Every structure is written in C-alpha cells, then in structure tokens.
Curated annotation (Swiss-Prot):
Homodimer. The keyword Metal-binding applies. The lineage of its organism: Bacteria, Pseudomonadati, Pseudomonadota, Gammaproteobacteria, Enterobacterales. Zn(2+) 1 binds at C144, C147, C197, C200. This is Chaperone protein DnaJ. The gene is dnaJ.
Amino acid sequence: MAKRDYYEVLGVKKDADEREIKKAYKRLAVKYHPDRNQDENDTGENFKEVKEAYEILTDPQKRAAYDQYGHAAFEQGGMGGGGFGGGGADFTDIFGDVFGDIFGGGRRQRASRGSDLRYNMDLTLEEAVRGVTKEIRIPTLNECDVCHGSGAKPGSSPVTCSTCRGAGQVHMRQGFFTVQQACPTCHGSGQIIKDPCNKCHGHGRVEKSKTLSVKIPAGVDTGDRIRLSGEGEAGEHGAPAGDLYVQVQVKAHPIFEREGNNLYCEVPINFAMAALGGEIEVPTLDGRVKLKVPAETQTGKLFRMRGKGVKSVRGGSQGDLLCRVVVETPVHLSEKQKQLLRELEESFVGAAGEKNSPRSKSFLDGVKKFFDDLTR
C-alpha cells in the first residue's frame, strides 16, 4: 500500500513551522499511543506512521530531502516500508525527547545540572521593611557523600562505554543520511557503572534535608524572589547543582497597607476634633509621631508624612506614610452628651446654620431642583 504524505499524516500544511508540527504530533501521539488507545482494531500502525512523519519533518535536512524527492529519499536501507527497526532511530529517543513527561519515559542525557528549587517564605511587614535573616530547612537531592557523586562504589570507577567509546552518542544510517542519537547502552552518559555505590545505588545523589541561613534584604515585597546560587538539587554524577529561589510573601498587617514603597493607614478622629482641629498621635514603623489636624477636616482627607514609608530594596528613595482620616460618629452617649448635641443641632437650623454644613446645603439644593424639574 502506498505511503501517505507526511504532511497529510500530521494534518499540517507544507509550509508549517516546527511549532505547528510538534503541536500536531503531540495531539496525534496521545490519540494513537498504544498505552492510551483502546481501539482493538488499531494495530499500532497509525502511531508508527505519525511518529515517522514527525521525525522526518522536524529534521531540517530530512525535510528538505523529503520535499524534493518524496518517500524515495528514504527507501535505501533506512526507513523503507515505514519500519523503524534495523538502522532506524530508537523509538524511546524520538518520542521521549518531546513527550517523556506525558508517558513517564524520555531518554537519559549526559550528566546534567541539578534542578532548581523554590521555597515560599512568609514575612511580616516589619521583617520585609527592615530586612531579616531566617533559617530554612528544605528537602532536596544532595551529592552522595560516599561516592561523591560518581555513583560508583568507593575504590571503583565508572568505565568507558564500549558501545559509544565514551562519546555518549552513536551514528545510525538512515537513507541518504547518517544521524546521531543517544547511545542505547549508556543512555548518553558515555560511562557504565559496573559496581554501584551501596548508599545511592549508582545515582550519585541521595535525598536529604539541609538547613540554610537566608538573608532577606530590607524593602522586599510580595512577589520578589531571592536566588541562592548552587543551593538547589545536586547535579547528576558531579554536574553543577541547581539554584534555590526564595519566593517572598508578605502577610497582611493589622494597621498598614503597602503600595509600592508607600504605606497607608486609616486614622479615626472624633467629630469635635474634625471640626475644631487638634493634634493626634499616629503609628509609624519607627514609633509614634505627632500629626496636626486642621479645623474643618473631613473624612477621607489624606495627610502625607514624607520618608516614613519603605526604603526601596534597590537603595536610594524611601516611600511615604499616608494617613487617611475617618471622622467617627460617637456611640454610647450619656444623657448629658445627647442634650449637648441637640443644642448643637438646633444651632444649625435656618440660614445661620447653612454655612456650617455647605456640602449638606448644596446636596439639599440639588435634590430640591431635581424634584422641581420632575414636576414641571
């Protein structure tokens, strides 16, 4: 039976880029993979066809040859008839590169750098503003202290792979081309551990918790990240370790809210002080300070206290503290207080009292005009 066009197999156009081809392959590979496909009539040929098309169209040289010669470019001792045996590329190498995370596979590479780790650290506002040093304990993969990362039992050493002679790669003939792939014997490492370490069982790494002292600079905020170089997981077989990233989260404060380098707080005052003015104490992160409240202050008035905010983590400028005044309505009044308020209320009646509440007069005038317009 004639082989189908590779572009048709993947359902992409002839000018499709590599991203489109990989996307199509991923979708079809999941659909036809033997571990997931429950169709009894499917013998696996669909999956082989998709895999073959993907390998050709993601290799620039092979794709160029296919575009020029079609299937004939690969019919001489390579992939004729759609097979991947003999001189063909190993299935796990092709499929594992892209989808090892889906099916749990993926080939081993040369000794690689250790994985990065992340640690979420909660801080109080005071700690974030002033800076702090904290000890943290993290579980990670550390270099084996018996074999020192080699994976081999002390007194022995890994030996050079006889298949690839230490290169970690082998060359295979495919049609007009010679392709390179990971050595199937050593899985790309170039070495074989014949006598593995008893502690790490040849992995070169062991699970272990470690304690670190982390210095948090002054001025950090939620979302900031601190990098500790080389404090991540140990690399494979002596490769460099990854990094540890400390992710900062600042907890809510009962008094202050932070926006950038500025701090905000609400300051309640009684209506007598709002009307007559006076002096109050307000909190800052450095202690209490005096704030003068002018007469006739209204709710929502902002008072800026320069330099009482947060110093920038990058140095230099320092934010401000902004105090928002809230005029508080008195509660639990005594009879004497109620009587005094009634007398005050009576003084506001009539034209003489209009100047005491200009916003109220303006509002009432607006309401009156609104209803007058409705009745015209």
